[in-house]
Design a protein with these regions (language model features):
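N-terminal Rossmann-like NAD(P)+-binding subdomain of aldehyde/semialdehyde dehydrogenases
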Residues: 1-32
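A general structural motif at alpha-helix termini
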Residues: 8-9, 107, 121, 170
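Histidine (H) residue identity feature
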Residues: 8-9, 75, 120, 200
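Rossmann-like NAD(P) dinucleotide-binding subdomain of oxidoreductase/dehydrogenase enzymes
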Residues: 23-165
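ALDH superfamily catalytic-core signature
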Residues: 65, 135-206
């Protein structure tokens, strides 16, 4: 439970917002060039069952900062948690003087509702967090897509590392929230000269 609470605090504190959306301008002999960001409009988002509320909160905050709204197609196994998170976001928007329905969801998400969303003429951008199948579907949908697929992050350890600290950090990372997050360490690649020492400290970390 503590790890899940920490994940929500990290989302609240670290999700980029409007401060990351800047206007860039430069001038030269041929005139002035101005680059200014603009919203896509309504973004379609597919979310996983492993981090349902965290993904919905992070997606919505970033998308809203860019002037967008979002319609979610959550993983069916996480629909209750997803609806709860979406309701909290809309309540927060209203309490802050913002609009209602900044984020919405289908009540009974399926592969069919996901396909409808990906083909909808008023949704120009699809964001997907999940396994390789859903990410591949989004990136081959013919629309602009952002895909965050399954991860298998390696921890690389060589002779320049603080071996004891490396062991501690690897164990802390791979046991965080039962290793559910795709960003958590899943494997170790170590140079042969420090393998025995690294194994010693890994065992000491239990």
């Amino acid at each position: 439970v503590g790890d899940k609470i920490l994940k929500h605090h990290l989302v609240a504190d670290k999700t980029p917002g409007t401060e990351d959306i800047t206007t860039t301008a430069w001038s030269g002999d041929r005139g002035l060039t101005l680059i200014e960001m603009g919203p896509f409009g309504v973004i379609g988002a597919i979310t996983p069952c492993t981090n349902p509320s965290e993904t919905i909160l992070c997606n919505t905050m970033g998308m809203l900062a860019g002037g967008n709204t979002v319609v979610f197609n959550p993983h069916p196994a996480a629909i209750k948690t997803s609806i709860y998170a979406i309701n909290l976001l809309n309540e927060a928007s209203l309490e802050s003087g913002g609009p209602d329905n900044i984020a919405v969801t289908v009540e009974k998400p399926t592969l069919e509702t996901s396909n409808v969303m990906m083909k909808h003429k008023d949704i120009p951008l699809i964001a997907a967090t999940g396994g390789p199948g859903v990410v591949t579907a989004v990136l081959s949908s013919g629309k602009r897509g952002i895909g965050a697929g399954a991860g298998n992050p390696p921890a690389l350890v060589d002779e320049t590392a603080d071996i004891r600290k490396a062991a501690t950090d690897i164990v802390n990372g791979c046991t965080f929230d039962n290793n559910l997050p795709c960003i958590a360490e899943k494997e170790i690649v170590a140079v042969s000269s420090i393998v025995d020492e690294l194994m010693h400290y890994l065992v000491a970390e239990n």
